[in-house]
């Protein structure tokens, strides 16, 4: 089953400090769970500095319990980075790997 995990960072310095402090642990956690991650990335502002505003992950797991366990143990979430956080079951509709950007920031 696919689940969309979406977190919106706390605003201001608190959010920036938590994101910076937990960045390494976050990426280590994602590497440890790479087998279930379909897609992931940060949400950004439209400003030139690309300030991060949150995180999105799509995971492929066997159950809601597994999705919740993954989400609840994710380091950004555990550290209290997010002002809002949701885990929502989803269905894949359109799928166009050829349309994916070649770089992390897009083409």
Where do the model's predicted regions map?
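Conserved, structured core segments of small domains
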Residues: 1-107
């Amino acid at each position: 089953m696919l689940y969309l995990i979406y977190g919106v960072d706390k605003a201001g310095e608190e959010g920036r400090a938590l994101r910076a402090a937990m960045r390494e642990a976050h990426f280590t956690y994602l590497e440890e769970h790479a087998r279930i991650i379909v897609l992931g990335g940060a949400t950004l502002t439209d400003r030139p500095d690309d300030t991060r505003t949150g995180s999105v992950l799509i995971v492929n797991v066997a159950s809601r319990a597994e999705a919740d366990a993954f989400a609840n143990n994710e380091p950004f979430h555990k550290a209290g980075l997010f002002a809002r956080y949701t885990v929502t079951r989803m269905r894949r509709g359109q799928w166009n790997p050829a349309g994916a950007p070649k770089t992390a920031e897009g083409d």
